[in-house]
From Swiss-Prot:
Lineage of producing organism: Bacteria, Pseudomonadati, Pseudomonadota, Alphaproteobacteria, Hyphomicrobiales
Similarity-based family: Belongs to the transaldolase family. Type 3B subfamily.
Known role: Transaldolase is important for the balance of metabolites in the pentose-phosphate pathway.
Cellular component GO terms held in the UniProt record: cytoplasm
Catalytic reaction(s) noted: D-sedoheptulose 7-phosphate + D-glyceraldehyde 3-phosphate = D-erythrose 4-phosphate + beta-D-fructose 6-phosphate
Organism: Chelativorans sp. (strain BNC1)
The protein, known as: Probable transaldolase
GO terms, molecular function: aldehyde-lyase activity; transaldolase activity
Length: 217
């Protein structure tokens, strides 16, 4: 599974990138707003930190304007993935963009039918929103499983990018089902390494080592 971080905070991105575990970044208009910086400026800096795909979202809702904005975003860096909404105009833009060799992340997916259309449109990534589906009282992981089955049935190349992740359990379940990518808030990504028994075991090892009076090297 690939790990993307879902943020426009360059300090968080830089810290996580230094671990060698980060495969990409996703942003959206809300995250850009939280950064307090111009979209082109902050996205360019993110692309300089991360070698993998960096999703930058269009804000237009009609095909012509989506394509205009996509052209601007694409010029930021070669690793930009254009993020488009799962609408008919968004799918039309997806088809046009991927046909010209650009990466596209189709976002705001809430059904397997939508995911099927995105794959038909040649999407590089499909972003089903797990947490928001859970908020409706429906198990978001069922959607991931349905998409995985459909994509496997037809050998679609579109990667399932599990989004709206709220917990480490979301990450685990998405990995078990077979999502290709999990885009995770920084706090959740950092929490994946934590376990109380790991901390307890390390504490015991260090205490015993201190009793030996030894040093390595």
């Amino acid at each position: 599974m690939k790990f993307f971080v879902d943020t426009a905070d360059v300090n968080e991105i830089r810290e996580l990138s230094e671990t060698g575990l980060l495969d990409g970044v996703t942003t959206n208009p809300s995250l850009i707003m939280k950064s307090g910086r111009p979209i082109l400026e902050v996205t360019r800096e993110i692309c300089e930190i991360v070698d993998g795909p960096v999703s930058a979202e269009v804000t237009a809702v009609d095909f012509k304007e989506m394509m205009r904005e996509a052209d601007i975003l694409s010029k930021i860096a070669d690793n930009i993935a254009i993020k488009v909404p799962l609408t008919m105009d968004g799918l039309k833009a997806c088809k046009a963009l991927t046909s010209s060799g650009r990466m596209v992340n189709v976002t705001l997916c809430f059904s397997a039918n939508q995911a099927l259309l995105a794959a038909k449109a040649g999407a590089t990534f499909i972003s089903p929103f797990i947490g928001r589906i859970d908020d409706m009282g429906i198990d978001g992981m069922e959607l991931i499983a349905e998409i995985r089955t459909i994509y496997d049935n037809y050998d679609f190349d579109t990667e399932i990018l599990a989004a709206s992740i709220r917990s480490v359990n979301h990450v685990k379940q998405a990995a078990i089902i077979g999502a290709d990518v999990a885009t995770v808030p920084p706090a959740v990504l950092k929490s994946l390494v934590k376990h109380p028994l790991t901390d307890k075991g390390l504490e015991a090892f260090l205490a015993d080592w201190a009793k030996t009076g030894q040093k390595i090297g």
